[in-house]
């Protein structure tokens, strides 16, 4: 669902409607400083999950813990992904046409409430390990569900966690309640960053050609559903979920109560991010001190996203960013391998 709500006019994270491509209300004209702050903040936030998610993906690929094992995307998976995404998008479109938008978004809010708590807890876990006081006991727990008895007993759930994980879960739950009750843009971004980082960390491409297939297929998917139909725009306007990063362009004027947002869909972060993470793992596999492929593709993404923001601001159409953010990463990565 990362690409469903990308770069289109959507209701902002605080619940106020926005009716321009960059999330600006019709009569509001942002100041140059506010616009620069919003776009610069989105660019910075986009880089965080890619950089740290890629670093964590290296450790994830070496982990022997079953719960930390990454999901490997094959060429077949990449080819099918645009088809599955299209079916999901059209299914949501039909749901919003048939059923009440209020009830659908209520179900989606609860769904992303649970997912967001788990994603944010997983994101916070390494940091909690570093700041957790050494003099406090770190007790171990195990959540075990089995089916049957005796020799026919079968494990359904076997999850081990400790005190640090419970603290992370508690903090994440507070953010989750904040998001569900207020739909505040900061809570939205905390969940969005957690989703993006987990995606880059846990979704692994098996080779460069798979990444090219995935990026190319999703480019065609975006072009068709945005320019060919009104399906994506309709779903995006109706869909309320933390699947985008937002930043207010009127922050300097209204502070934290700002309501006119620029936005960046998580698909523009996660999809290029898993490709960049693949190149970092390739660098590591070469057993050299340099990270040439990773830094080259990372800089290409920065250049592509920066150019996209310029084009979007100039021509008032954000969808063109697919050409730069994904095409730039493919070209820099494939040229060097």
Language-model features, listed with the residues they occupy:
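A membrane-topology feature that recognizes alpha-helical transmembrane segments
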Residues: 2-337
């Amino acid at each position: 669902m990362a690409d469903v709500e990308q770069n289109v006019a959507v209701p902002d994270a605080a619940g106020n409607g926005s009716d321009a491509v960059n999330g600006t209300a019709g009569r509001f004209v942002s100041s140059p400083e506010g616009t620069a702050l919003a776009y610069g903040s989105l660019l910075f936030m986009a880089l965080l999950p890619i950089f740290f998610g890629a670093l964590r993906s290296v450790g994830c690929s070496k982990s022997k813990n079953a719960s930390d094992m990454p999901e490997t995307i094959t060429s077949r998976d990449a080819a099918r992904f645009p088809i599955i995404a299209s079916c999901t998008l059209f299914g949501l479109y039909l749901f919003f046409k048939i059923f009440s938008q209020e009830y659908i978004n209520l179900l989606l809010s609860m769904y992303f409430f649970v997912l967001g708590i788990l994603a944010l807890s997983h994101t916070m876990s390494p940091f909690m390990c570093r700041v957790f006081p050494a003099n406090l006991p770190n007790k171990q727990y195990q959540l075990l569900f089995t089916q049957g008895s005796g020799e026919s007993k079968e494990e359904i759930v076997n999850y081990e966690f400790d005190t640090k994980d419970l603290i992370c879960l508690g903090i994440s739950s507070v953010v989750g309640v904040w998001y569900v009750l207020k739909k505040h843009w900061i809570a939205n971004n905390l969940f969005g960053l957690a989703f993006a980082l987990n995606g880059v960390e846990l979704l692994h491409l098996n080779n460069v050609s798979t990444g090219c297939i995935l990026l190319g297929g999703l480019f065609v998917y975006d072009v068709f559903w945005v320019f060919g139909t009104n399906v994506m725009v309709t779903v995006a306007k109706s869909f309320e979920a933390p699947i985008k990063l937002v930043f207010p362009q009127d922050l300097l004027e209204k502070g934290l109560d700002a309501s006119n947002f620029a936005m960046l869909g998580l698909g523009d972060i996660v999809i290029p991010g898993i490709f960049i993470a693949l190149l970092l793992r390739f660098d590591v596999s070469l057993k050299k001190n340099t990270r040439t492929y990773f830094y080259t593709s990372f800089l290409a993404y920065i250049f592509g996203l920066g150019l996209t923001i310029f084009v979007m601001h100039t021509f008032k159409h954000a969808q063109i960013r697919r050409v730069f953010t994904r095409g730039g990463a493919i070209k820099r990565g494939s040229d060097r391998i």
